Regions:
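Extracellular beta-helix/beta-solenoid repeat scaffolds
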Residues: 1-6, 22-34, 39-72, 76, ...
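Extracellular beta-sheet/turn segments enriched in Thr/Pro/Gly and aliphatic residues
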Residues: 73, 145-162
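Structural beta-strand segments of beta-rich domains
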Residues: 80-82
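Short, acidic Ser/Thr/Gly-rich low-complexity loop/linker segments typical of extracellular
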Residues: 102-125
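A short, solvent-exposed loop/turn motif at the edges and junctions
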Residues: 62-63, 121-149
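Boundary/junction segments of secreted and surface-exposed precursor proteins
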Residues: 161-171
């Protein structure tokens, strides 16, 4: 996790920024002259940014909340990333649908998916900063939501635990850790066993 702190960081046309590991934090004001489009990632700009004419910068991940000034035909865009995980009692759920900002993705065999959205654009049209967007997770009729402040890349885990349908013959305990649960069929608890729903558990019946 690198940190740059000086009175001013001046970058010439040959300069670029590379972030490794847990990212680079730049606490200094930045003045950047670039002659070709710059693609950077995971840099936290904690102070102002000034781009010279024709300097185009696109950043995936990271942070840029302070004032950004641009010269003629220059631009800055921040694309935020959301890493999603969907679990069923701790096990990955493949094929869950994730919807955010009109984009639809499916979780893979590891229960993971990634979504991206443009969080900020500074160009000749002005400075457009997006706010909170709703992330929807769907498995059949089961739906969960997450409010994502897109100014910050982040990760989120959805729980989508299943309750077995049919007749259960062993003690079934629903734990808050894996809530919410979903039941998609008839459930019968045999007379010689029991089902325990712990405090804080949410059970949804389709």
């Amino acid at each position: 996790n690198g940190v740059h702190n000086a009175s001013l960081l001046t970058m010439s046309v040959q300069s670029t920024l590379v972030s490794e590991g847990r990212g680079l934090e730049i606490q200094s004001p930045v003045q950047w002259s670039c002659s070709q489009p710059q693609d950077i990632a995971d840099i936290r700009f904690m102070s102002t940014i000034s781009l010279a004419p024709l300097c185009e910068v696109e950043m995936i991940g990271g942070q840029a909340n302070e004032a950004i000034t641009i010269g003629t035909s220059a631009s800055f865009s921040l694309i935020s990333t959301l890493d999603i995980e969907v679990l069923d009692k701790g096990l990955p759920v493949e094929g869950a649908t994730i919807i955010v900002d009109g984009q639809t993705v499916q979780t893979d065999a590891l229960g993971s998916a990634t979504a991206q959205t443009t969080a900020r654009t500074v160009d000749a049209q002005g400075d457009v900063q997006e706010g909170t967007k709703t992330v929807t997770m769907q498995i059949g009729s089961f739906t969960e939501f997450f409010a994502w402040n897109v100014q910050q890349s982040t990760s989120h885990t959805f729980m989508a635990s299943t309750v077995p349908s049919g007749t259960i013959s062993s003690w079934l305990i629903l734990e808050e850790t894996w809530s919410p649960y979903r039941l998609e069929g008839d459930l019968t608890v045999a007379s010689n066993t029991r089902m325990t729903v712990n405090d804080g558990v949410e059970l949804r019946i389709a």
